[in-house]
Regions:
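FAD-binding core/adjacent interface of flavoenzyme oxidoreductases
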Residues: 1-8, 72-133
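Beta1-alpha1 glycine-rich phosphate/pyrophosphate-binding loop at the start
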Residues: 2-74
Length: 133
């Protein structure tokens, strides 16, 4: 049986990256519930500096709880979304929750695409997360 809960402020934000954290921050005191695998927002434009050693890796992340103080953070993974019943199923370390919402924001991020350029796969470097830096 799933534990049911309501999204804070009626808004469920799926993803804690640039878009998701910005929406939650804009909602201000109204609040929101953020579902994210990480408890931080990664500032990807600074990853090359972290990789080169000119910037410490801790300076390219912002804790979501600090950036969005009025938001509830669910560290977990979205496993189902039903727009008809306005519910989302979220799997966390402590259990699986069914979250009811009035509005949802899908801000799940992107994936890197490697272009078909000769030699890129063998010699190119990509920066998508902190581990890459």
């Amino acid at each position: 049986m799933l534990e049911a809960r309501a999204a804070r402020g009626g808004t469920l934000v799926l993803g804690g990256g640039f878009a998701g954290s910005y929406v939650a921050r804009l909602l201000g005191q109204r609040g929101a519930t953020i579902v994210s695998l990480e408890n931080f927002m990664l500032f990807t434009p600074l990853l090359p500096e972290a990789a080169s050693g000119t910037l410490e890796p801790r300076h390219v992340v912002v804790p979501l709880r600090l950036m969005c103080p009025h938001a509830e953070l669910l560290l977990g993974k979205l496993t189902a979304l039903d727009p008809t019943s306005r519910t989302a199923t979220v799997e966390t370390e402590t259990g699986t929750f069914e979250v009811r919402y009035e509005q949802s924001v899908l801000a799940l991020g992107s994936i890197s695409r490697r272009l078909p350029i000769p030699g890129l796969a063998e010699h190119g470097l990509g920066f998508k997360d902190l581990a890459d830096a």
